[in-house]
Amino acid sequence: MKTPGAADGASPARPGNVLCAGPARRERRRTMERLQQFTQLLCGSFDNAAQFRQMQAKGEASFPFARHVNTPCNEKIRGLPQGFDGVFVVEESYYTVNGRTHASPHLFLFTQQGENIKLTSYDLPQGCGKAGFTFETMGEVAFGDLSPSKKFTPAVYTCRGGVWEGGSTSMFTPALKFTLFERFSSEGLEVSETMEMNGKRTFGYDVPILYRRTEDTAQA
């Protein structure tokens, strides 16, 4: 029996996009590998113990001992769109100065943007306050209930010689400016964050915080 619509001697019609499925699949795999490499550098437990000791020796008493814990959390988000390629990450930052510790948690989404990686900040899930929010305390949440931050300008990271770097500037209010610049590599994380009110710095340091991966999360 002839395939409907096929002329004598012609091959049966093939489903659309078969010819381009191979290249498209390879491109998607390459994209995912690039994003995976980025998140492998970013995720885990880090601190700036070595830098902190150096700053203390210089008499910089106000420079913090900082810990950074980054954990992928897609497993806790229900209803991700089919073919979703992004990686949600819970970022837990802890800053200790003169014996007092301040916690600063965030929920980020990392996606591929061409050859670059884009960071989009999300509001914490409804009912979750910044006090005590961690990957461990985060419950399951529906993707549709998550909202991108309206204040934070997405950051874009570019890879140069194995080092990812990028950041953004956000105007939280007409007078309050937040500036972020980061570098990620196998050596660790370099993070510079400043907050300015009417041009006067109210948060941040003269040098970036230099995080190194702690032994319990050393990369294989």
Residue spans of the language-model regions?
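Soluble ligand-binding/transfer domains with enclosed cavities or grooves
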Residues: 42, 47-220
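N-terminal helix-cap/turn-to-beta initiation motif at the start of protein domains
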Residues: 31-45
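Short, charged low-complexity linear motifs
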Residues: 27-35, 189-190, 197
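Short, Lys/Arg-enriched N-terminal segments with co-localized hydrophobic residues
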Residues: 4, 19, 24-31
